[in-house]
Amino acid sequence: MYSEGSTLATLAVCLIPLFVALKSSSKIAQSWSAFRWLTLAYSALSLLTVVGTQARTGLVALAAYIGLLLKKHKINFKVFLAICMIPLLIYAIAPKSWFHRMSSIEDATTSEKSAIGRIVVWRWTLDYVSERPLFGGGFYSYNANAGILHHYQQGDEVEIKQQGGKAFHNIFFEVLGETGYGGLFLFLSILLHTILLNRRTIKRLGGEVGVIGGALSHSLIIYCVGGLFIGVAFYPWIYYLYGVSLALSTVEES
């Protein structure tokens, strides 16, 4: 399920805040010192996954995580050092092909078929849903765009020639196209409720439980940022995070 490069890289970055939280706020970490090194090793492997897949979505997700770190922590020496270590580590291990792939992000929106294809599908989705606004077209409804996407191109964009249907490649357009505005409302409600649950947990309990709650929110935000370019709305990760956040919200203050 998560074997596609962009999806795998995004999920790998989603795991990093959870590993970091478990490193400092886990009962196992308190009783087994090697566990902390294990979480650091898994975090490093997650970075290697971003490099190894050469997926630009992974870099976007990683940038989102760095942004969350900057927002959450005061810029002291430890935080500054940790953030600086990420690009240095990538620079040390990444092949030239990775840098070439990442350098194409800037002009991808006008010259690369993969990126243009996504944008064209999103335009088509808005048109498609205008005829079935409440419930959308159902699962795999993207197949309805087979052979007609060229009608939604604009200006000097690279030409899209595709006989079969092209997937949504965006969790929000995916939900909109397949379940309509009704489904999108429910989906956004789940995301918002997850964030609010964890904010309440952080405010009410703080401490180790609060750290876990913050990590759950960060993982969800990273997943959504990566999900702007991949169709993973119905993969289980979002719903795992929602379920754990609900469970965490029931913890009583000791």
Residue ranges of predicted features:
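Alpha-helical transmembrane segments of multi-pass inner-membrane proteins
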Residues: M1-K72, A82-P87, Y91, H193-R200, ...
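Loop-to-transmembrane alpha-helix initiation sites
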Residues: S6, G231-L241
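Membrane-interfacial segments
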Residues: S24-I28, T57, N76, M102-E106, ...
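Alpha-helical transmembrane segments of integral membrane proteins
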Residues: S33-S43, R56-A63, K78-I83, R101, ...
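A membrane-periplasm/extracellular boundary helix in multi-pass inner-membrane enzymes
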Residues: A44, L48-T53, L70-K113, R123-E131, ...
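Hydrophobic transmembrane alpha-helices and their immediate junctions
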Residues: I66, K71, E178-I222, V244-S245, ...
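Long extracytoplasmic/lumenal interhelical loops at the membrane interface
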Residues: A108-R123, E131, F135-T179, R200-R204, ...
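Short, charged juxtamembrane terminal tails flanking transmembrane helices
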Residues: E253-S254
